[in-house]
Swiss-Prot record:
PANTHER family: NUDIX HYDROLASE 26, CHLOROPLASTIC, UDP/ADP-SUGAR PYROPHOSPHATASE. Belongs to the Nudix hydrolase family. RppH subfamily. Pfam families: NUDIX. The gene is rppH. Residues 7-149 form the Nudix hydrolase domain. This is RNA pyrophosphohydrolase. A motif (Nudix box) lies at residues 40-61. InterPro entries: Nudix_hydrolase, NUDIX_hydrolase-like_dom_sf, NUDIX_hydrolase_CS, NUDIX_hydrolase_dom, RppH. Keywords: Hydrolase. One of its GO terms (biological process) is nucleoside phosphate metabolic process. GO terms for molecular function: bis(5'-adenosyl)-pentaphosphatase activity; guanosine-3',5'-bis(diphosphate) 3'-diphosphatase activity. It comes from Wolbachia sp. subsp. Drosophila simulans (strain wRi). The keyword Hydrolase applies. Accelerates the degradation of transcripts by removing pyrophosphate from the 5'-end of triphosphorylated RNA, leading to a more labile monophosphorylated state that can stimulate subsequent ribonuclease cleavage.
Length: 162
């Protein structure tokens, strides 16, 4: 997988968690079965944290967050073969993501998934981190396992100290 790094679209992902230690997930318009955490591409010249905050505002409609940390490494995933020609005109075989852990500092009313007028998600909820993988589409499950493994102890420590 990593031997073709130029075939992976640079992207950021955001694990946004609330005071109870639950993560934000949204149900995409193109699926009735799968939920995902916010993510999106990095624009040319854009810093990774700046991209993560922009994507969060675009997809979740809030900036009431505290950036806690980011993943130590890029996390790669491949798209299914049948999806590659559809996504980004076949330019990429998958995505390489840097994940950011952010604590939500607002109230649920501060979340507006319709913020941009062209939402990514049709609904959203807070979900326990232990069940995030089960809600994800198959080709993102390993990514979610890696992100949870890296961030779960930080989330637990943060919710205890809140």
């Amino acid at each position: 997988m990593v031997e073709q790094k130029d075939k992976y679209r640079p992207c950021v992902g955001i694990m946004l968690f609330n005071r109870q230690g639950h993560a934000f997930i949204g149900k995409r318009f193109d699926s009735d079965s799968y939920w995902q955490m916010p993510q999106g591409g990095v624009d040319d010249g854009e810093e990774l944290e700046q991209a993560a905050l922009r994507e969060l505002l675009e997809e979740v409609g809030t900036n009431k967050v505290k950036v806690i940390t980011k993943s130590k490494d890029w996390i790669y995933y491949n798209l299914p073969e049948e999806v590659i020609p559809i996504c980004w005109n076949g330019k990429y075989s998958g995505q390489k993501q840097r994940w950011f852990l952010m604590k939500f500092c607002g109230e649920d009313e501060d979340i507006d998934i319709n913020y941009t007028g062209h939402p990514e998600f049709k609904e959203w909820r807070w979900q326990g981190i232990d069940s995030l993988v089960a809600s994800a589409i198959s080709f993102k499950k390993e990514v979610y396992k890696t992100v949870i493994e890296e961030f779960s102890s930080i989330i637990k420590a943060s919710t205890i100290s809140s």
